[in-house]
């Protein structure tokens, strides 16, 4: 897998060798390794930029704290230590991909992206392992291929907050002191047994929940793991009368004084990353954007971009779509400054940077700017309706699009883009609208312990919208995967 000797002349957006052969597999491995490398480079730069002191103490605090939604690792640890956590988790994922000798696919890329995405708010190098071990044992005992279930192993890390709570708080006390974390043998046993058990349940749930939403929620693991999380939370906490932890808060006045978080650093980092993706895709696509126009015509339903267009075109899509996300975030963050009646939201926090990666998860498997736009429009429509009602009732507007819950919700609601692609922009807007209504309420169902809450929300939205479309015989406008 030598980047310097990987000949872009052998790559074509419509070349079967790219689509199905080793080249696409290699390009996924190369690009994910480059993302991991970018985290390693950003870590010391982040320490310098934020004047972060006690780097190792900050990293230790990230690794040993309960991490339910939404735990901002920039606040809990620091800018550099958070990037380093993402780097070592990303490297671990790279090593699993390489050692398993799996032929990397779009789902493998998605699994990697969701791992590194949540390393900024809830997933760390400690709590990622038990469920991966569980899936590995599931494959060994049931004689299934781990290579074919690699993406499920990576998806299962969404249950990481349960692992951290069981290990560091659940068996000790109702409260948690981030400055003095404790661990017990019983807690470790709980965490390991839970991870192993989850490894046997998640692979069994995924096919059934996918059938429920018929593939209209790209974050299909979100619905499966969200439902599982409800049962776990209800039994382990509600039924047993054990209090769930609060979101870990720590005194960090320098960070909280930043109006827009680490806006400058994160913008520069993402601009470099997205530019690199576009250039890399352009070069490996025979110095052209050939195929990207056709990708943008896709309905985003039942189409594997990697298989149809090649990874080089998917890299171009990654970069272009990423710039669209970045433009949206920079816009909504300044809206409260322009319109004084809007409540101030957040900025480029750890969760915000994390969901940028989460929103790009399926950029090789269905997500693209054209079909995403109606989903974004749906969020804007709900906000406009709320502002209108509040104006008529003469009450304060309670939230803005820059609130963390709505930023996170929208990132995962983009997984509903198949609705706009298949049924048209109006249905896509409705899907975004419905998802926005519930996006800040669903985490209470599982106690905030499921990191893929946005995918869970999108899944519930699909479960409501699909039977309505069926009942009123709303016909898909576009049957083919391109139009």
Regions inferred by a protein language model and the residue ranges of each:
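Membrane-interface helix-loop-helix junctions at boundaries between adjacent transmembrane segments
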Residues: 18-26, 144, 160-267, 442-457
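Structural signature of hydrophobic alpha-helical transmembrane segments
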Residues: 75-87, 119-129, 183-197, 267-271, ...
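Hydrophobic alpha-helical bundle architecture
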Residues: 98-99, 116-124, 135-149, 153, ...
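N-terminal signal-anchor module of multipass membrane proteins
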Residues: 2-123, 277-288, 310-315, 323-329, ...
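Transmembrane helical segments that form the transport core of multi-pass membrane transport proteins
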Residues: 104-106, 288-390
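C-terminal transmembrane helix pair
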Residues: 191-209, 220, 402-476
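Short, structured motif recognition centered on aromatic/hydrophobic residues
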Residues: 92, 107-118, 129-139, 152-157, ...
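Membrane-interface capping segments at transmembrane-helix boundaries
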Residues: 282-293, 468-482
